[in-house]
């Protein structure tokens, strides 16, 4: 997959303090995540600069399945063609009262596809577009 100027390969993973929906609903862990803005979308510094983006900017990320808004973290610690969303955020159930509405979920952008040989979910084969919103 080759990404063009505003297209990225969406990747996701866990963070040291967050692992699943349940941990995002724990007040002490969510307080840490909010304090350090851990829900942000990671984008490579060179790619961000080419799109006129700065650390903390609000962007719109979209795939054929979803469009969401999220603030970005500009970093050298990611491949230029990738955008990273930490997992565990973006809880859609209002019953998860603590974590509800915080961050976005990579699952919202990911179609239900299975790799035919291994039977694993194809969750890292998603292309997304990213553009700045607001000022």
Regions found by a protein language model. Name each.
Residues 21, 26-42, 46-135:
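Long, contiguous, secondary-structure-rich segments that constitute the structural scaffold
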Residues 1-31:
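Long, low-complexity segments enriched in small/aliphatic residues
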């Amino acid at each position: 997959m080759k990404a063009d100027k505003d297209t990225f390969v969406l990747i996701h993973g866990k963070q040291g303090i967050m692992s699943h929906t349940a941990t995002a609903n724990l007040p002490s862990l969510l307080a840490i995540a909010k304090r350090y803005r851990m829900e942000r979308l990671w984008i490579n510094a060179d790619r961000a600069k080419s799109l006129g983006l700065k650390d903390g900017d609000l962007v719109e990320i979209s795939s054929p399945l979803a469009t969401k808004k999220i603030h970005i973290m500009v970093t050298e610690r990611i491949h230029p063609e990738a955008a990273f969303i930490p997992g565990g955020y973006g809880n859609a159930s209002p019953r998860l009262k603590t974590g509800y509405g915080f961050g976005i979920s990579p699952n919202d952008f990911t179609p239900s596809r299975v790799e035919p040989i291994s039977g694993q979910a194809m969750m890292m084969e998603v292309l997304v577009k990213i553009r700045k919103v607001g000022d």
